[in-house]
């Protein structure tokens, strides 16, 4: 059995100019990064805005195992299958973060015969967007520290600076640092810290901005900290939004690549769904909707995180809402949610599938609350048994949700045809009637309680003293009408990563609220969610290498 990287390297890529020709995109519309990668020009993005809007398919998942359940793989395979059955389809997905690639995932460009290519480039430096975001973020940090050093005209309280530096790696040693040491020539000493780049507000802004002017407006709105009198200080107060936008002027343009089967794909932006909103860029998704009849996109982690944020935060910024939501389920994740230990997930256990179905059922119910039809995709693994698949199909039938087995990892486009046909049929026969979970006019507490009680099925929300103080400050500053972005473990509906399945009557504790005015939401932090991950005991980096001819080894 070939590895993902071996499959990717065996494919003869088409020039990206030829791949996108069928979408009406010409050579002059592209800014090429070699033969197989390109950015789409703003002139072309504006030119297609008058085109009809196609159908939107959102791919999400049940609460996952640590290895993930193959959402990206299913997204890519479904799009390939839709093209195979004659539907003009595009993909709009996130760019991988180098931290998890070097850490646990080893790659995040799909898998098997459902990959976006060139996968080595996409998983590593790609077109430099991550570096541009990192640079813009850290340029702001440098400008803040310089302002303090040069007399602090804005009277920024260095004890209340919210803005952190970032790096696109998992590096727990950088979570808490002290800067400005070494005497008066080296700045003002203060506590600081690093987040991973994908947790930066600038990443969220890039993924929500619609053009350069909107980018500058959002950058200016970033709250970097507070003055001695407790009033907020913004990037606009520092007058550096133009400089930051300049660094991002190319990064904001969507990246175009291809799948193994030649399906055009936007890969742009990459916020995590547990600590940010978990969706690719609005620009990429919107442009795909104007170029294709069907656009397949994804939202990070389980539907309790990524899909909720897609529907409550991203969708209001799109020209349409999803016409269907595909929920990816694997038998191994169902068994884990049914109480099976991680080292026994490959063993047949029909009763554990039955027990774990409660998790999938809740995700289906939640998607239906948004007025959107759901389809379950069983992402097939070699350890799956006929008995387990049969019982899962029986359970899905009991709640009247369409279900299809998908083998896109092993069989590519052909392995997703049944799923593609079911999704098209579902869209045709069950028109979506999208509605948001909550009204932004509700109070901060009420919006959080809506998410916790209706999506997670908790019974109560507790606000720690720090969070209560921050809510009062948010209200005082007039920020309380923004949507909520929950920062929560991806493994459970609750804030306890060990409470698997479908827990009920639990309490969730909000420990901190962080206003992200540039992004346009408030982050509510729960549990011990980290904005800078650490590496596992045996990071994927240990298996990576490059040969003398440049051949990449170990990405998977």
UniProtKB/Swiss-Prot annotation:
Pfam families given for it?
FTHFS
What is catalyzed by this enzyme?
(6S)-5,6,7,8-tetrahydrofolate + formate + ATP = (6R)-10-formyltetrahydrofolate + ADP + phosphate
EC number(s) of the enzyme? 6.3.4.3
Query: What keywords are annotated for this sequence in UniProt?
Result: ATP-binding, Ligase, Nucleotide-binding, One-carbon metabolism
UniProt xrefs under Gene3D superfamilies: Domain 2, N(10)-formyltetrahydrofolate synthetase, Formyltetrahydrofolate synthetase, domain 3, P-loop containing nucleotide triphosphate hydrolases
Gene Ontology MF: a single term: ATP binding
Q: Tell me the enzyme class.
A: ligase
Q: In which pathway does it act?
A: One-carbon metabolism; tetrahydrofolate interconversion
* Residues that hold ATP according to the record: 65-72
Q: List the GO biological process terms.
A: tetrahydrofolate interconversion
User: Which family does the record claim for this protein?
Assistant: Belongs to the formate--tetrahydrofolate ligase family.
Q: What is this protein called?
A: Formate--tetrahydrofolate ligase
| Protein species of origin | Streptococcus pneumoniae (strain JJA)
Q: Give the source lineage, highest ranks first.
A: Bacteria, Bacillati, Bacillota, Bacilli, Lactobacillales
């Amino acid at each position: 059995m070939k590895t993902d990287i071996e499959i990717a390297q065996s494919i003869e890529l088409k020039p990206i100019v030829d791949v996108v020709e069928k979408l009406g995109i010409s050579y002059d519309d592209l800014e090429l990064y070699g033969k197989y990668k390109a950015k789409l020009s703003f002139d072309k993005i504006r030119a297609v805005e008058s085109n009809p809007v196609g159908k939107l398919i959102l791919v999400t998942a049940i609460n996952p195992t640590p290895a993930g359940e193959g959402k990206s793989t299913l997204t890519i395979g479904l799009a390939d299958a839709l093209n195979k059955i004659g539907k003009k389809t595009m993909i709009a997905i996130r760019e991988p973060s180098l931290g998890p690639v070097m850490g646990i995932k080893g790659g995040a460009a799909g898998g098997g015969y459902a990959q976006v290519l060139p996968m080595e480039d996409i998983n590593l430096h790609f077109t430099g967007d991550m570096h541009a975001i990192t640079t813009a973020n850290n340029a702001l940090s440098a400008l803040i520290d310089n302002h303090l050093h040069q007399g602090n005209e804005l009277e920024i309280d260095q004890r209340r600076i919210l803005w952190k530096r970032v790096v696109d790696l998992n590096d727990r040693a950088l979570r808490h640092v002290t800067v400005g040491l070494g005497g008066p020539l080296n700045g003002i000493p203060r506590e600081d810290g690093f987040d991973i780049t994908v947790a930066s507000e600038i990443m969220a802004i890039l993924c929500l901005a619609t053009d350069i002017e909107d980018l500058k407006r959002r950058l200016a709105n970033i709250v970097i900290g507070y003055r001695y009198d407790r009033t907020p200080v913004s990037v606009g107060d520092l007058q550096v939004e133009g400089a930051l936008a300049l660094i991002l002027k190319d990064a904001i343009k969507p990246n175009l690549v291809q799948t193994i089967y030649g399906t055009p794909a936007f890969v742009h932006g990459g916020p995590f769904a547990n600590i940010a909103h978990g969706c690719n860029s609005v620009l990429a998704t919107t442009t795909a909707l104007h170029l294709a009849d069907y656009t397949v996109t994804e939202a990070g982690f389980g539907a309790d995180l990524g899909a909720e944020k897609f529907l409550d935060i991203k969708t209001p910024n799109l020209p349409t809402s999803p016409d269907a939501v595909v929920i990816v389920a694997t038998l191994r994740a169902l068994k884990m949610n049914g109480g099976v230990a991680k080292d026994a997930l490959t063993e047949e256990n029909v009763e554990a599938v039955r027990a774990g179905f409660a998790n999938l059922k809740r995700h289906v119910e939640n998607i239906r609350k948004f007025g959107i039809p759901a389809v379950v995709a069983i992402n097939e693994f070699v350890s799956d048994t006929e008995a387990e698949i049969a019982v899962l199909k029986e359970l899905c039938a009991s709640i009247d949700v369409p279900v299809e087995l998908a083998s896109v990892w092993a069989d590519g486009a052909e392995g997703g045809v049944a799923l593609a046909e079911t999704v098209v049929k579902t869209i045709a026969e069950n028109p979506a009637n999208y509605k948001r979970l909550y009204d932004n006019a509700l109070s901060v507490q009420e919006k959080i309680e809506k998410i916790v009680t209706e999506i997670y099925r908790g019974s109560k929300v507790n606000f720690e003293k720090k969070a209560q103080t921050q809510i009062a400050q948010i209200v005082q500053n007039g920020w309380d009408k923004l949507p909520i972005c929950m920062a929560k473990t991806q493994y459970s509906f609750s804030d306890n990563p060990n409470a698997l399945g479908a827990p009920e009557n639990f309490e969730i504790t909000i420990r901190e609220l962080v206003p992200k005015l540039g992004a346009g939401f408030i982050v509510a932090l729960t549990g011990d969610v980290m904005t800078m991950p650490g590496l596992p005991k045996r990071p994927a980096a240990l298996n990576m290498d490059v040969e003398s001819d440049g051949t990449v080894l170990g990405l998977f």
